[in-house]
């Protein structure tokens, strides 16, 4: 079998309901391709008749029969499909959300005890295997955990599940083991491509879950690195402390926490950054967009900034990197009519250059501008238009920054206005066509994005190296 496709570059943030501005749970993750690769994406709705009853992986020899009662769910699969589905993020008709996966690290002690399974499951498969069949975030943990125990996995991953009440984060351990923690309601979680959970209580199944034999597994292979008087730290046992982590991973957690807890002074290379923190104020959708667009603004590590040196500007991997494929914020809101409680905010391409667009998820179709992405470059879809804007604006980022900021603010304001207007209509007893509302939002964003592309192209053309100030 050919070498498996792996996407090592995602960044995740999770926001508990008491830490969010509106009492919602928010799960967000960038899906980033490997260096030198770009993966076109699309957003679709998978209806029960389109869900496979027997699933076969492309990346491994894994196959499995699936239940005959799938729910409808949204999905953000690879647009071309040649490497498998890679559904990545979605919300089902029970308003349960799933984001999969955040590739994470492990260590040789774990892999020696429970090797990865070449015929197991991976990121390609997980949303398709789990999301259509779960009615709570906790059910998602238990279903995926059972599949991991039975079939194994060929890679180490972190997976988020959410509903109106809870967010759960599951991390795989070796080939067949797993551990999961409920995100505290008043906290947020930052998770780059590292094993993250740093506290676990085996006697508290309300907030902590794991594979049935995990404690025996830890004892048998001497994986617990904490002293007897300390709480068990899964990150020490199952994670990594590599030089690469301090360049590629820990700085991303640091910059997110620096924005959400500016009063806490930390080292970007520290292995002791907390998995979860209570923010200094409540977190908004705009905050989530900002941290997932981060390129270390206001530090010497910003590749676009005026501080620092040529070396420092390239030392850490930005969150808002060039090879982001898509970013989804899965926003499950309380005290709303069920048909509009779940919102999936979508962005394509490099995050410093794009916007987040809200969609109602209890629908049968997604607007073509977001659903029809081709292999060739066209400006009639959101993915390629965003890719063009980023490539054109990057060489002169500071020149284009005001236009990018205005576009972001205006389009997200329109999104909030749309959400509020629909809620008012429903509460007044009016009938609302949610697919039509999604289409109107898509049409508006298409117009604004085309206008931005026109402006960026014009300005970039005037900044070309071969420009000359004299003309006839």
Curated annotation (Swiss-Prot):
<comment type="similarity">
    <text>Belongs to the peptidase C69 family.</text>
</comment>
<dbReference type="InterPro" id="IPR047804">
    <property type="entry name" value="C69_dipept_A-like"/>
</dbReference>
<dbReference type="Pfam" id="PF03577">
    <property type="entry name" value="Peptidase_C69"/>
</dbReference>
<dbReference type="GO" id="GO:0006508">
    <property type="term" value="P:proteolysis"/>
</dbReference>
<keyword id="KW-0224">Dipeptidase</keyword>
<keyword id="KW-0378">Hydrolase</keyword>
<dbReference type="GO" id="GO:0070004">
    <property type="term" value="F:cysteine-type exopeptidase activity"/>
</dbReference>
<dbReference type="InterPro" id="IPR005322">
    <property type="entry name" value="Peptidase_C69"/>
</dbReference>
<protein>
    <recommendedName>
        <fullName>Probable dipeptidase A</fullName>
        <ecNumber>3.4.13.19</ecNumber>
    </recommendedName>
</protein>
<dbReference type="GO" id="GO:0016805">
    <property type="term" value="F:dipeptidase activity"/>
</dbReference>
<keyword id="KW-0645">Protease</keyword>
<feature type="active site">
    <location>
        <position position="10"/>
    </location>
</feature>
């Amino acid at each position: 079998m050919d070498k498996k496709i792996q996407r090592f570059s995602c960044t995740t943030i999770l926001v508990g309901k008491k830490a969010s501005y509106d009492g919602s749970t928010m799960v967000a993750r960038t899906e980033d391709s490997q260096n030198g690769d770009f993966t076109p994406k699309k957003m679709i709705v998978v209806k029960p008749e389109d869900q496979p009853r027997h699933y076969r992986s492309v990346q491994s020899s894994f196959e499995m029969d699936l239940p005959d009662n799938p729910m409808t769910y949204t999905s953000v699969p690879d647009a071309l499909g040649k490497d498998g589905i890679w559904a990545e993020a979605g919300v089902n008709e029970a308003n349960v959300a799933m984001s999969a996966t955040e590739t994470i690290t492990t260590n040789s002690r774990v892999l020696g005890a429970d090797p990865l399974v070449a015929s197991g499951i991976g990121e390609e498969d997980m949303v398709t295997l789990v999301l259509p069949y779960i009615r709570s975030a906790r059910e998602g943990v238990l279903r995926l955990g059972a599949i991991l125990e039975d079939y194994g996995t060929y890679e180490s991953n972190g997976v988020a599940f959410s509903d109106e009440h809870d967010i759960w984060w599951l991390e795989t351990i070796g080939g067949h083991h797993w551990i999961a923690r409920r995100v505290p309601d008043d906290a947020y979680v930052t998770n780059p491509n590292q094993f993250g959970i740093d506290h676990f209580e085996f006697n508290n199944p309300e907030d902590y879950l794991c594979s049935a034999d995990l404690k025996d597994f830890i004892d048998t292979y001497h994986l617990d690195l904490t002293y007897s008087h300390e709480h068990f730290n899964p990150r020490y046992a199952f994670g990594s402390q590599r030089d690469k982590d301090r360049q590629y991973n820990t700085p991303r957690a640091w910059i997110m926490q620096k924005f959400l807890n500016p009063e806490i002074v930390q080292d970007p290379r520290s292995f002791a950054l907390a998995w979860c923190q209570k923010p200094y104020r409540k977190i908004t959708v705009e905050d989530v967009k900002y941290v997932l667009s981060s390129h270390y603004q206001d530090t010497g590590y910003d590749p676009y900034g005026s501080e620092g040196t040529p070396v420092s500007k390239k030392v850490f991997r930005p969150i808002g990197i060039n090879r982001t494929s898509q970013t989804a914020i899965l926003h499950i809101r309380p005290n709303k009519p069920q048909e509009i409680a779940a919102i999936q905010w979508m962005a394509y391409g490099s995050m410093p250059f794009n916007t987040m667009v809200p969609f109602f998820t209890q629908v049968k179709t997604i607007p073509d501008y977001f659903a029809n992405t081709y292999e060739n470059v066209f400006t009639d879809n959101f993915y390629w238009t965003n890719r063009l804007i980023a490539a054109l604006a990057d060489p002169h980022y500071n020149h284009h920054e005001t236009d990018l900021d205005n576009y972001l603010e205006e389009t997200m304001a329109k999104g909030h206005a749309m959400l509020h207007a629909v809620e008012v209509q429903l509460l007044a007893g009016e009938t609302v066509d949610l697919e039509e509302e999604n289409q109107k939002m898509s049409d508006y964003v298409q117009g604004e994005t085309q206008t931005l592309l026109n402006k960026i192209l014009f300005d970039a053309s005037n900044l070309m190296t071969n420009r000359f100030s004299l003309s006839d």
